């Protein structure tokens, strides 16, 4: 049976995973996990037994989260007797799950806000089939965040292998890519920038996905040099809505089937409430939610657009609204002068 997870020097097979799930028939509704394997085991237990789960980041300040006290964390709850004979049974239970999973926004622009998702919304973008089997994923996201959950479900539902590279240094990441012959990487543009400079190319990587931040052609060119065999695409996702659409390069297209679920007001992308999770913190403009993402149309009729910045990233300089991301791009474009700049 294939490896499920490589975490540091530890290897966990899918057989070990199933045995661990069956062994202790309890879970933690609110859990700060000591390690990634324990986190995944608890997540899977909740999902396959239709139990609610609140995902807590290790550095989440609970004093900022109403209704949750420290004494409630890591307290086990008994589960109804169950037994899974193999991964087919586990995945069948997952795909029928009625669990509600609570995650929190990062809190970078204020207090963390909780958003409740069904398993259906969390796995909306998962693709299953023979072409997705036998893959090895670099796990580069925080596991309690939306992007981390989506990478997990994509890998898990195809019984792929996950290799933990979250918060690793550049040399460590390259060591994992080479040692495990990683085929798929999904990460923020910041993660890929931290891989620069590079000394060699890695031919095992078949697909590279970027998400969570603005990226640019200069970064795509460098990624292509590091991973010359990889297809590069960009994903638009949010804690509130999950994954919505992908792009090749920096140009997204809203699919025709859901184009009526979006609106743009003063360059800000608005998302229809039917695509969102549930949260008391959501405020709607009619039936639409203000994403805070500023875009520019490339072809409005066909639904093509580029992501410009977050609305709250704009700063006032001498009475003018300035986008730090555009300043960063301009500085990085000065050939031979600047190695890397972050604004």
Cite the ranges covered by each PLM segment:
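Conserved AMP-binding/adenylate-forming core of the ANL superfamily
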Residues: 1-26, 65, 78-81, 117-120
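Conserved AMP-binding/adenylate-forming
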Residues: 20-60, 139-142, 321
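Conserved pre-ATP/AMP-binding loop-to-beta segment of ANL
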Residues: 81-104, 131-137
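Conserved AMP-binding A3 loop
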Residues: 99-127
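Conserved AMP-binding/adenylation subdomain of ANL enzymes
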Residues: 123-136, 144-184
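Gly/Ser/Thr-rich phosphate-binding loop
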Residues: 196-252
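Conserved ATP/PPi-binding loop(s) of AMP-dependent carboxylate-activating enzymes
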Residues: 264-296, 302, 320-322
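AMP-binding/adenylate-forming catalytic core of the ANL superfamily
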Residues: 292-342
